[in-house]
């Protein structure tokens, strides 16, 4: 295959225990990779066969391998070379490491036991692991030193290496709900719009929802609605990039009115449309309680 883009992609994530392999795996998952952690190296050929037999869902795969599977670990480098020689899958090896004193500090902070720490000190276990991984580090296509990195900085490095401009690595979820049915427990930001005029008290609108033009126009015609909306949308445009910089893969914005049928639905629709035009992110809109009150709508 001459075009690199036609290859299926396999990223092998390995490196020092405690250096941040789990963070790297989670980030790759957010980038759209199918991720498997702690796969025994002996199973790599079977997994490659599975990738080749699956056209879509396994086109980009990340596999985490470390010394927890030490009985099989010695064969890892050989298995990787065999896969490269097959020329069927584009193989990249990400090696995550950190300095000895940083790893010691992290283990003490988390109170976890190093996988090689059998009757030896923590620092001896770390140094032994570094020796065992030396050859594998030598064949790595990418090496990240996380010694001076917080998790969000490590995520940024992984995105820089494996992401692309077309990868939707951040998702905006806009949800309408009714306070009488309870707060959405997964919301990051909640706004209360019960102070706006309520279409429920107008007979011809009572059984409609904010998706209906009659209700939508009624909610939007008020001066206080427009003032609130402009302030709200400016705030969201300011804070959403901050959520991404902090390493979050998504943000859930919840707009609530009394029943989740009229005002919150109309505002959620307008907010979704503007954010979708403003940001180059994946966006989903869901009206949680409109089914309870009347109708429901969910869209991407």
UniProtKB/Swiss-Prot annotation:
InterPro entries hit by this protein: P-loop_NTPase, RapZ-like, RapZ-like_N, RapZ_C
UniProt entry keywords in alphabetical sequence: ATP-binding, GTP-binding, Nucleotide-binding
GO terms of molecular function: ATP binding; GTP binding
UniProt-annotated binding residues for ATP: 15-22
Key word ATP-binding present: yes
Binding site for GTP: 66-69
Protein task: Displays ATPase and GTPase activities.
Family: Belongs to the RapZ-like family.
Protein name: Nucleotide-binding protein MCCL_0516
The organism of origin for this protein: Macrococcus caseolyticus (strain JCSC5402)
